UniProtKB/Swiss-Prot annotation:
SUPFAM superfamilies: Ribonuclease H-like. GO terms for molecular function: endonuclease activity; nucleic acid binding; transposase activity. It comes from Spiroplasma virus SpV1-R8A2 B (SpV1). This protein may encode an integrase, which is necessary for integration of the viral DNA into host genome. Keywords: DNA integration, DNA recombination, Endonuclease, Hydrolase, Nuclease. Residues 153-322 form the Integrase catalytic domain. GO terms for biological process: DNA integration; DNA recombination; transposition. This is Putative integrase ORF3. The keyword Nuclease applies. Belongs to the plectrovirus integrase ORF3 family. InterPro entries: Integrase_cat-core, IS30-like_HTH, RNaseH-like_sf, RNaseH_sf, Transposase-Integrase, Transposase_IS30-like.
Length: 322
């Protein structure tokens, strides 16, 4: 893959030209030998030298300065219309669409291809072009690191393991369940996600007890008319889910628990929780967040066009299958 000469490459080239180590018998510079020494193609070295009238005039500093001046003039940024810019700002800075989703929505809206690829759009966002705000990316534009800590918030005994699941033919009707905890563990949200459609549900908890979790679980089931439609629920071995038998009876389903300290066994809910955390970062006091605010965020999440669903939303996929 071709790459431009770095400043240090140019310094080495200048030193080699001045030292006259690679001279031919006729006194001319052996460009092929220099290129081989620098591990570059002969044409690359020739193009670099031809920036100057003669080889003796070559200067690494001047060459680098000329390079950056040309780069500044070569501004290929696309000129959007006012309507297009407003749409981009709305989708990215308000609804926080991912770059790939923004490109797809742009195509649906204007019936023309987005002017750049996903990789270049990420570059635009990080450089702040067109008013893009980097903090609206997932994880606010920072690299995500797993801490590898085990969960020590209380464990359950006497339950069904995920290894007890038999004859799971598809993800239709299978839910994953979790709680998202707020500041100082004094507030929380109960969350569920349907595996096939990625439809996300979230409701505030008044407290972090098993009885409250059971109550809010029933509210979600009733509101979404899910009684008898759930094939199974996968969750953690935490004490707030100790009323799992009551949940099974009410929803006419089965509840299965992951191995201790193994959140990777329910990867979808962990991923969806990170989307919720994008709006409500760690340290958020959910006692100060209304259910209306949570509903707005959940609606934005469920309205996202997802590549894994062939560019339809979780909301639409859920209605088609449940």
């Amino acid at each position: 893959m071709y790459s431009h000469l770095s400043f240090m490459d140019k310094v080495k080239l200048e030193q080699l030209l001045l030292s006259k180590i690679f001279l031919k018998k006729n006194g001319e510079q052996n460009i092929s030998a220099i290129a081989k020494y620098l591990n570059r193609h002969r044409s690359t070295i020739l193009r670099e030298i031809k920036r100057f009238k003669t080889i003796d005039e070559y200067s690494a500093y001047k060459s680098d300065k000329m390079y950056y001046e040309k780069r500044k003039k070569n501004n290929k940024r696309f000129k959007f219309t006012e309507e297009q810019l407003n749409f981009i700002h709305l989708r990215f800075n308000v609804y926080h669409d991912s770059p790939s989703e923004l490109i797809y929505r742009y195509f649906l809206k204007f019936k023309v291809k987005f002017p750049v690829c996903v990789k270049t759009l990420y570059k635009w966002i990080r450089l702040g072009f067109y008013g893009f705000l980097k903090q609206n990316l997932r994880h606010h534009g920072k690299k995500y690191k797993r801490k590898g800590k085990s969960d020590n918030r209380g464990k359950l005994t006497d339950f069904k393991s995920i290894w007890d699941i038999d004859n799971k033919v598809s993800n239709v009707g299978w839910l994953e369940m979790d709680t998202v905890v707020g500041k100082d563990h004094k507030s929380a949200i109960l969350v569920l996600v349907e595996q096939l459609s990625k439809k996300y549900f979230a409701i505030k908890l008044e407290n972090h007890t098993a009885r409250e979790v059971e109550k809010k679980f029933k509210d979600i089931i009733i509101k979404n008319n899910l009684i008898g439609k759930i094939k199974g629920i996968i969750t953690d071995r935490r004490k707030e889910f100790s009323k799992w038998r009551e949940m099974e009876i009410f929803a006419e389903t089965q509840v299965y628990f992951c191995d201790a300290g193994s959140p990777q066994q329910k990867p979808l809910i962990e991923y969806m929780n990170s989307e919720l955390r994008h709006w409500f970062p760690k340290g958020t006091d959910f006692n100060k967040v209304s259910q209306k605010q949570i509903d707005w965020v959940v609606n934005v999440i469920n309205d996202k066009l997802r590549p894994c669903l062939n560019w339809i939303s979780s909301k639409e996929m859920f209605l088609q299958n449940i």
